[in-house]
Amino acid sequence: MSTSRTVDRAFETALYDTGDDALDTAASLLAADPAADAELLARGEEFVATAWRRGWQPADLVRIVRRELDDVHVRMVAALIRAQAPHDRPRGPRWAAQLDAVPDQAPPRTDRFSHATDVLRLYRLLLRLPALEPLDDAPGAPRREARPESRALARIRALLAKAEATGYPEEAEALSAKAQELMARHSVDEALLAARAQGSAVSPDTPGACRIGVEPPYEQAKAVLLDAVADANHCGAVWNEPFGFSTVVGFEADLEAVELLYTSLLVQAETAMTKAEAGQRAGGRKRTKTFRQSFLAAYAHRAATRLRAAAEAATAESAATGAAADANLLPVLASREVAVTERLERLFPETTTTRLRGVSDAAGWTEGTRAADDAHVERRRPLR
């Protein structure tokens, strides 16, 4: 039997079945034919390339494998992604950053049967991946070029790092507010620069999109927090619960702000929740999943109010004073808002709303609101 035929038979036996017996039979075929290894790797690279054509990106693939399978499969898919990359078409800077973040640990050495079983489990998952909304540029379209980080972003990142590190709630609150203020001003500056490059009040720039992981537990509350951060920074977000991410649409500077701020606020929220639980236990009250869900829901609700207020105040100040004082500012911002909405509606013509479940613990809500009032609004390293 040829090597290619061995792999074909193994795939026919295992990939279109869900049972362990089929998996064992197929793994035995592959284990008995060492010459099939190269063909098996080539087929895996083809599965990865197919995932790219169906709208998936490197971070998405790693995320779904980590969510559905085990660490060995994460290492395997990471190796496939790296092996396929030299054969891929040119991509943008966000894609390149995701490739850089792909885990680089080699899969563990096991016996041939166990290895074949793990490979087939991974390929089963890759084969069943549905199409996602395409976020990157179409082949042949002008590519977005990577830009050096601006001084404003570097300053925001430093503020957020301080906010996460401080043990003083009042300091964290002040740092967070300052970070959101700087984000809003940076967004205004970027909008005006783009419009002036075109010589009109309508920016020539176009909205981009990225996916940000929304990991368990308490995904609903985290998705609400991400939506609040996106809204405060002139972006829109749509949560995909089954695959554990939200798609955020906006202009590049605003997407960077959302990634940084959401990551930082999540760190601050989880730190504050741990402290609040310790305080409740010291008072003799047992804390539960409901407490944590209520805490994070209240945190997201209150953070949304604070972020929106800080962003609106900074934008209003920029419109009236300083280098951003420009008659074109309001038309520019309005045109960008329309562009974001249109891109969001093209990507997601049908969306639904969902009610936040499990928010019934008054102590959790109170503690979460207090923690959001104390949160810093600064930035960290972006999620890709």
Q: Where is each model-derived feature located?
A:
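Short amphipathic alpha-helical coiled-coil/interface segments
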Residues: 156, 160, 172-186, 296-303
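Extended, helix-rich structural scaffolds rather than catalytic motifs
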Residues: 1-148, 188-384
